[in-house]
Amino acid sequence: MNKVDVRAKLAELGLELPVAALPVAAYVPAIRTGNLVFTAGQLPLVNGTMAGFGKFDGEITPERAKELAQICALNCLAAVETVADVNKITKIVRVVGYVNGVPGYINAPVVVNGASELFLAIWGDGAKHARSAFGIA
């Protein structure tokens, strides 16, 4: 994958890299080991405020759910920035998403596309990754 100016690419997409949220418990936003960075789970926080509440396919539409997943992905990039330069990212290895849905909700993978599609928009085909998407109630 070619080097990408992440902030410039985000600006082209009408987005910007947020400031990483402060941890609310005994963990760090991200940790680096060698050339790998692992991020903590992220919520759809914008300037410290939840961007959405509710269950998908209940109070939150599928379209809005994808937007919230994109916000979580942006927050992951902000977490990376606490331990490494996001412009040095050369590969997205794995994405895991937990989607709060109504009982019987089966479209968690569609929601998590909001994150995957952001990474693909930034890094192109080089951002193809393994992924798990879980629906939780």
Q: Can you name each region flagged by the protein language model?
A:
Residues M1-A137:
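Short, polar/acidic, helix-capping and beta-turn segments at strand->helix junctions
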